[in-house]
């Protein structure tokens, strides 16, 4: 038993009671509203809300009010509609989203797309300062401009540089003084004024690829190498002689190796005089060895050793033969040219040496 009274048995009874009290108060409120409505004086229609008044002005700055008007519903005309909407209210309302396929500038006036001039002011041109100077000079009929004229050309043709003049003007001035492609020309006596003229070096016109100023400038080393003529190989030979020394054999061999690949070396015969010298050397050696072996060999081993020691003269003669002619450059680099010109000569030399060593170091059968 509670002191505040007995609680209802149904748990939803309290909610039902509250809902009933709310409905009673709500009905009383509407009765009061219905009684007060006829007593109000008829107010004049507000400007901009009537059908005729709202359609006369121009398009509204709001995008959701720029579309065509909605078809008025029957309940907005005051006929059989609800009493809570007075006659004429919302008759001139527009729909929120216009039935357009896409949104344009008229749909969003606050997001106006800039024109081409505005875009050029915001975007930096894709040209270097040297390219801007070259364009200014080439567009002039006299092919020469002063510093102030170059400034004027850049500012007039590229609106991006109108914002801050101090930065890019310093860069142009530095490019004129540091770049070898721009030459300073003094004023004539009959041309009064301030400042010298600037012109393009004729050798640097290829740097911009005939007006394609967006292309990067070629390296200076490439332009210097392109200026070499056919006598460049001769200059390299002289430099090699000075650095290595013409008296030393290493310097001569290095010079011969560096001269390989030139047109002069390609036109010469590959195995001309060198083959003749080596064959003559081998012929002399082979004839001497044959004469030595054909002579009656002594019967004692000590005597044979003496003959072998005498044959050193022929070996020294063979070793004294030139390996390669100093006037002919061979295509093999880093390796010496053999004395024997062909495989047959090398095999013959091997057989002769083998027979020489065996016949003179060991005794023949039947000889004591």
Swiss-Prot record:
<dbReference type="InterPro" id="IPR018122">
    <property type="entry name" value="TF_fork_head_CS_1"/>
</dbReference>
<keyword id="KW-0539">Nucleus</keyword>
<keyword id="KW-0804">Transcription</keyword>
<dbReference type="InterPro" id="IPR036390">
    <property type="entry name" value="WH_DNA-bd_sf"/>
</dbReference>
<dbReference type="InterPro" id="IPR036388">
    <property type="entry name" value="WH-like_DNA-bd_sf"/>
</dbReference>
<dbReference type="GO" id="GO:0043565">
    <property type="term" value="F:sequence-specific DNA binding"/>
</dbReference>
<dbReference type="InterPro" id="IPR030456">
    <property type="entry name" value="TF_fork_head_CS_2"/>
</dbReference>
<dbReference type="InterPro" id="IPR050211">
    <property type="entry name" value="FOX_domain-containing"/>
</dbReference>
<keyword id="KW-0010">Activator</keyword>
<protein>
    <recommendedName>
        <fullName>Forkhead box protein I2</fullName>
    </recommendedName>
</protein>
<feature type="region of interest" description="Disordered">
    <location>
        <begin position="33"/>
        <end position="54"/>
    </location>
</feature>
<feature type="DNA-binding region" description="Fork-head">
    <location>
        <begin position="124"/>
        <end position="218"/>
    </location>
</feature>
<dbReference type="Pfam" id="PF00250">
    <property type="entry name" value="Forkhead"/>
</dbReference>
<dbReference type="GO" id="GO:0005634">
    <property type="term" value="C:nucleus"/>
</dbReference>
<feature type="compositionally biased region" description="Polar residues">
    <location>
        <begin position="255"/>
        <end position="264"/>
    </location>
</feature>
<dbReference type="GO" id="GO:0003700">
    <property type="term" value="F:DNA-binding transcription factor activity"/>
</dbReference>
<keyword id="KW-0238">DNA-binding</keyword>
<comment type="function">
    <text>Possible transcriptional activator.</text>
</comment>
<feature type="region of interest" description="Disordered">
    <location>
        <begin position="243"/>
        <end position="272"/>
    </location>
</feature>
<keyword id="KW-0805">Transcription regulation</keyword>
<dbReference type="InterPro" id="IPR001766">
    <property type="entry name" value="Fork_head_dom"/>
</dbReference>
């Amino acid at each position: 038993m509670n002191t505040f009274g007995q609680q209802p048995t149904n748990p939803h009874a309290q909610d039902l009671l509250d809902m009933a009290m709310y409905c009673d108060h709500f009905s009383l409120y509407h009765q009061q509203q219905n009684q007060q409505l006829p007593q109000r004086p008829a107010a004049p229609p507000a400007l901009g809300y009537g059908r005729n008044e709202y359609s006369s002005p121009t398009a509204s700055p709001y995008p959701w009010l720029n579309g065509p008007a909605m078809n008025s519903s029957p309940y907005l005309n005051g006929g059989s509609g609800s009493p809570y909407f007075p006659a004429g209210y919302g008759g001139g309302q527009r729909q929120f989203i216009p039935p357009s396929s896409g949104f344009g500038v008229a749909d969003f006036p606050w997001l106006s797309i800039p024109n081409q001039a505005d875009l050029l002011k915001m975007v930096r041109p894709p040209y270097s300062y040297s390219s801007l100077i070259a364009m200014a000079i080439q567009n002039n009929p006299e092919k020469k401009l002063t510093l102030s004229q170059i400034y004027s050309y850049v500012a007039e043709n590229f609106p991006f540089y109108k914002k801050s003049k101090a930065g890019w003007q310093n860069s142009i001035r530095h490019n004129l003084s540091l770049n070898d492609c721009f030459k300073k020309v003094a004023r004539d006596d009959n041309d009064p004024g301030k400042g010298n003229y600037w012109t393009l070096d004729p050798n640097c016109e290829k740097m911009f690829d005939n007006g394609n100023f967006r292309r990067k400038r070629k390296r200076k080393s490439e332009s210097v190498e392109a200026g070499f003529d056919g006598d460049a190989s001769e200059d390299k030979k002289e430099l090699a002689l000075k650095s290595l020394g013409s008296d030393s054999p290493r310097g001569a061999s290095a010079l011969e190796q560096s001269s390989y690949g030139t047109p002069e070396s390609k036109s010469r015969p590959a195995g001309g005089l060198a083959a003749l010298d080596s064959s003559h050397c081998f012929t002399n050696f082979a004839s001497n060895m044959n004469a030595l072996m054909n002579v009656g060999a002594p019967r004692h081993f000590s005597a044979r050793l003496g003959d072998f020691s005498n044959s050193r003269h022929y070996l020294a003669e063979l070793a004294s033969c030139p390996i390669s002619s100093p006037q002919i450059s061979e295509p093999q680099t880093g390796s010496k040219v053999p004395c024997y010109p062909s495989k047959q000569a090398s095999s013959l030399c091997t057989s002769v040496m083998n027979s020489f060593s065996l016949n003179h170091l060991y005794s023949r059968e039947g000889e004591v």
